[in-house]
């Protein structure tokens, strides 16, 4: 019989119990022993669920208190020297992730091309890796008590781990330093009864992976020689694996391949017979989107694969970390739509149905699922209606002309100060929103409350003497879901939460049909804010690429068509804002780079589509209307030509946690437009010093002119507390004024 495996399960819990427990601990409202007790119960619940769903190999080690990469750094003592004062305990673990009053947090980067963030391991001259504790063994022993020999340890492999690290001087030597530690972890697991061990090596779906194949042979020869009893699974995901003709010869029991995002290439490798002597762990249910699987199409794929492998195991294409837990609470949705959704729990059921069907037993549940899938495909809300683009202006006047007109209209000082858009959402704001959603607060009372918050924060910004203000986005849960509630073709879930970083969870909207602008999105709040001040207030919108990348997108049309549908809707809102007197409009593309394909050969087509969609949205404005955009953590040197091609008058970029690395992109490339490189890290509660911000501004001014540089935090301030926000912005404004004075002198 074919087996079913899982790569990873969501940490959050059905009701976000994980998030609530960790944040209660941070706030001092939960003792560590109680936190550990609650997290253990969550882990056990997750294990039991997967066992009951019929999963034969259940992941252990996918659960974390913050991030699985940080877990490995902590286990191997790869800890920055600045945290030496700490004992090796949970306080240190969270300090590395979040920073403290004296130390900046470690950098945070996107996990490949997802919206999950990992904590970057920092290697220094002083780093002395050793096995601080075998936490994976502890988790395995715990899991065996619940699921027996179904427990399958999961660990990020050494080559991927080092590839994701900073401060590496000698790559191969660093990998070699870790091998004895991995060996000990593996041997302890085998001694405790483990058989299969999943080693995640997703770096081998990237172009970089092609350069690491020889190192992989050395590493996995070592593992096979030193821990011969282990059944290692070399796991890849998010794309087709590179160099499979060579990797397939590694001395491992099985290979995990993604047949959703790398189907053609991986299938071709299988049909070449590369895995005839291997177990194949086939990722055939999408671990990153929420649509029910096409059972018949997938069964046909399995029948293609089957004859070419020694043994076949079915699994999701990636960890289910990237999807919500269950659809069972989404009773408000149209039944056809709800029945066409598949979150983590439903995906496990789909795998069971496929395994049974592949073994020759198409159950009643199989036929019912097939019927639900067909009903969604036939639904009348899916037409691919794309308005004609013939009348849409795609180019603006030259930047120098626009810059002069905007300078005359706005009358801003050099080094203008602003924020990215959102301000803290206090418990009171959340309480009012919840009361309104439950019908316990009238629409008018809720709007009045939002206006009160806008009025209060406009006054705070004026007191701080910021130059360009924002309304604060108090009406928004997040920068994508809010738009999903107002555009046709979107819907939102009640509990469709997904982890983004640490305890931060997002609830991506679902794009299920044709997207259209049917009502104002942010007009009322923005116009009200502008009526309270003579300073310019930015209109705040999210761009088409970010809306797509941070939504669960429909999978029945091309991404370029979807980008353009959303761009036309955003264009309509921009025109409303401009007609209402809003002189600066920010169209955030925070996730533009996040959606970049992992393979270079596929990247330019995506970037071309992204630039075209941004221009559809923004190019119809008058020359004196200033278009801003904002982008999050990224390697910008790789896409700087496309950033320039967006032709935004001002771009702000998250840079503080990269410790200046992004600035190097602009030291080697001419960037002619306005730009703000974030001068302090908003992801940490730590208040920056005036000297730090001055240094960041001065370094930026070495490669950017004072006429083009803006001063801003590196991201929105929604997750910070009010006192922290005001204190940090006071420092930002004071530092900027001092630099202005230096420039004047």
UniProtKB/Swiss-Prot annotation:
Its EC number is 2.1.1.14. Zn(2+) binds at residues 630, 632, 654, 715. Pathway: Amino-acid biosynthesis; L-methionine biosynthesis via de novo pathway; L-methionine from L-homocysteine (MetE route): step 1/1. GO terms for molecular function: 5-methyltetrahydropteroyltriglutamate-homocysteine S-methyltransferase activity; zinc ion binding. 5-methyltetrahydropteroyltri-L-glutamate binds at residues 16-19, 110, 550, 594. CDD domains: CIMS_C_terminal_like, CIMS_N_terminal_like. Binds 1 zinc ion per subunit. GO terms for biological process: methionine biosynthetic process; methylation. It is an enzyme of class 2 (transferase). Catalyzes the transfer of a methyl group from 5-methyltetrahydrofolate to homocysteine resulting in methionine formation. This is 5-methyltetrahydropteroyltriglutamate--homocysteine methyltransferase. It comes from Streptococcus agalactiae serotype V (strain ATCC BAA-611 / 2603 V/R).
């Amino acid at each position: 019989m074919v087996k079913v495996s899982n790569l990873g399960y969501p940490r959050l819990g059905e009701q976000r119990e994980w998030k609530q427990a960790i944040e209660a601990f941070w706030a001092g409202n939960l003792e560590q022993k109680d936190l550990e007790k609650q997290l253990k119960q969550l882990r056990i619940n997750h294990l039991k669920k997967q066992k009951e769903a019929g999963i034969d190999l259940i992941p252990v080690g996918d659960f974390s208190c913050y991030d699985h990469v940080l877990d490995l750094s902590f286990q191997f003592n790869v800890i920055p020297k600045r945290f030496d004062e700490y004992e090796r305990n949970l306080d240190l673990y969270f300090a590395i992730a979040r920073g403290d009053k004296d130390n900046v947090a470690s950098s945070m980067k996107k996990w490949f091309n997802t919206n999950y963030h990992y904590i970057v391991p920092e290697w220094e001259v002083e780093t002395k890796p050793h096995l601080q504790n075998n936490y994976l063994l502890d988790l395995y022993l715990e899991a065996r008590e619940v699921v027996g020999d179904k427990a399958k340890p999961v660990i990020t492999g050494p080559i991927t781990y080092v590839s994701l690290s900073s401060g590496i001087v000698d790559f191969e030597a660093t990998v070699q330093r870790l091998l004895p530690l991995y060996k000990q972890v593996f041997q302890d697991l085998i001694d405790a009864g483990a058989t299969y061990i999943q080693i995640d090596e997703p770096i081998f779906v990237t172009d970089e992976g092609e350069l690491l194949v020889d190192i992989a042979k050395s590493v996995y020869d070592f593992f096979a020689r030193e821990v011969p009893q282990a059944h290692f699974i070399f796991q890849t995901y998010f794309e087709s694996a590179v160099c499979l003709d060579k990797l397939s010869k590694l001395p491992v029991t099985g290979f995990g391949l993604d047949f959703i995002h790398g189907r053609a290439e991986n299938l071709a490798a299988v049909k070449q017979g590369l895995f005839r002597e291997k177990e194949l762990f086939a990722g055939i249910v999408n671990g990153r989107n929420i649509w029910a699987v096409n059972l018949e199409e997938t069964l046909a794929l399995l029948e293609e694969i089957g004859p070419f492998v020694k043994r076949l195991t079915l699994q999701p294409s990636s960890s289910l970390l990237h999807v919500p837990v269950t659809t069972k609470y989404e009773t408000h949705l149209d039944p056809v739509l709800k029945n066409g959704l598949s979150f983590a729990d439903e995906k496990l059921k789909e795998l069971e149905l496929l395994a049974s069907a592949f073994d020759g037993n198409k159950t009643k549940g199989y036929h019912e699922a097939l019927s639900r899938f067909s009903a969604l495909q036939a639904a009348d809300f899916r037409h691919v209606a794309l308005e004609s683009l013939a009348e849409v202006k795609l180019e603006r006047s030259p930047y120098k002309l626009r810059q002069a007109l905007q300078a005359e209209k706005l009358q801003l000082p050099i080094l203008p100060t602003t924020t990215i858009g959102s301000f803290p959402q206090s418990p009171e704001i959340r309480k009012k929103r919840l009361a309104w959603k439950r019908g316990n607060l009238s629409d008018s009372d809720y709007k009045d409350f939002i206006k009160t918050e806008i009025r209060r924060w406009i006054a705070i910004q004026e007191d701080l003497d910021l130059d360009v203000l924002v309304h604060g986005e108090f009406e928004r849960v997040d920068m994508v879901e809010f738009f999903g509630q107002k555009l046709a073709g979107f819907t939102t879930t009640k509990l469709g939460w997904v982890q983004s970083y640490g305890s931060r969870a997002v609830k991506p909207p679902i794009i299920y049909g044709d997207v259209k602008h049917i009502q104002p999105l942010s007009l009322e709040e923005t116009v009200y804010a502008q009526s309270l001040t003579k300073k310019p207030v930015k209109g705040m919108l999210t761009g088409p690429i970010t809306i797509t990348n941070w939504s669960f997108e429909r999978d029945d049309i091309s991404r370029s068509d979807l980008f353009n549908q959303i761009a036309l809707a955003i264009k309509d809102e921009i025109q409303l804002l401009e007609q209402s007197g809003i002189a600066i409009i920010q169209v955030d593309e925070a996730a533009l780079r996040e959606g970049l394909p992992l393979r270079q050969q596929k990247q330019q087509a995506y970037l071309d589509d992204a630039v075209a969609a941004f221009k559809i949205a923004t190019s119809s404005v008058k020359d004196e209307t200033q278009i801003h955009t904002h982008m999050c953590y990224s390697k910008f040197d790789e896409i700087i030509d496309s950033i320039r091609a967006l032709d935004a008058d001002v771009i702000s970029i998250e840079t503080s946690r990269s410790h200046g690395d992004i600035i190097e992109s602009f030291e080697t490339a001419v960037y002619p437009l306005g730009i703000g490189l974030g001068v302090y890290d908003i992801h940490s509660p730590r208040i920056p010093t005036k000297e730090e911000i001055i240094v960041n501004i001065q370094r930026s001014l070495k490669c950017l002119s004072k006429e083009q540089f803006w001063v801003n935090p590196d991201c929105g301030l929604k997750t910070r507390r009010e006192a922290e926000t005001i204190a940090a912005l006071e420092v930002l404004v004071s530092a900027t004024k001092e630099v202005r004075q230096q420039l004047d002198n």
